[in-house]
Amino acid sequence: IGGIAAGMSAAAKFKRLSPNDDVVVYEKGDIVSFGACGLPYYVGGFFDDSNEMIARTPEAFREAGVEIHTKHEVTNVDFSNKKVTVKNLNTNEVLEESYDKLMIASGARAIIPPIKNIDLENVVTLKSMDDGNKLRELMSKEENKKIAIIGAGFIGLEAAEAAKHRGKEVTVIQLQDRVLQEVFDKDITDLLEEELRENGVNLLLSETVTELIGDGKVSKVKTNKREIEADIVILATGVKPNTDFLNCDEIKMIRNGAIVVDKYGRTSVEDVYAAGDCATINSLITDR
């Protein structure tokens, strides 16, 4: 289930190890084997061909014997009977598929924070290829000079670098008092913050965005301390695993919906595995 990164890696590896077995992939979107980590650099103009983020096409996988169905969404998993329910998004046809082993690699989606007027034009996320194409187009317009980024995690800071590479005025607004606070100690984040400011990024820490302002299209970001002019607002407030189609009473998850796996990628359900943004990771230090 899912053919972006982890799913296609698993499919390709399994087919190499067991060439006589059927490997079937259902992907909700229309592309597979996509490296989303390249999005900020594509948006920033570090390279121009979006195909550089695609490792292999569906046709290449099919030639290798992997059966791929794009624009097909898995809507339910019956773990007891080892069946998945799939909807063809082109025809709305619903079908059932049985499995012997199941890999869940449904990824994650960008979190949309509960901010007033979040649906104004030029307010974007950066998670999918469509997001990247949209933001790249907006960034290429001369009139879009001021970029506000809400969130100072990996995506937020990489988006800041991309915008600066485009010659934009960049403001990063972070709820916490440090960038990447959940990832690095203060010694490291102090260096990151210094680097950001030296490169002209307006870094606003310990501020809460309360409202977006604009007449159809965003023009300002309002925080608990000030208003900032913005032609584009990038939402970089984290991601949520795409596991809503699963019954949490049947498969173990943590609070945010990520599927719990062991160091072999096994879930709490026999013959079911998970990997990628929809799953937890196993710590090499704690072995949990």
Question: What would you call each of these model-derived segments?
Answer:
Residues 20-22, 64-90, 97, 165-263:
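A Rossmann-like FAD-binding core segment of flavoenzymes
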Residues 1-71, 160-184:
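Beta1-alpha1 glycine-rich phosphate/pyrophosphate-binding loop at the start
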Residues 4-8, 30, 108-110, 130, ...:
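Residue-level detector of alpha-helix initiation sites
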Residues 103-104, 234:
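N-terminal Rossmann-like NAD(P) cofactor-binding module of classical short-chain dehydrogenase/reductase
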Residues 28, 154-175, 258, 266-286:
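Active-site substrate-recognition segment that forms the wall
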Residues 119-143, 216-220, 227-288:
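FAD-site-proximal beta/loop scaffold in flavoenzymes
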Residues 104-166, 202, 255, 261-263:
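Glycine-rich dinucleotide-binding loop and its adjacent helix/turn
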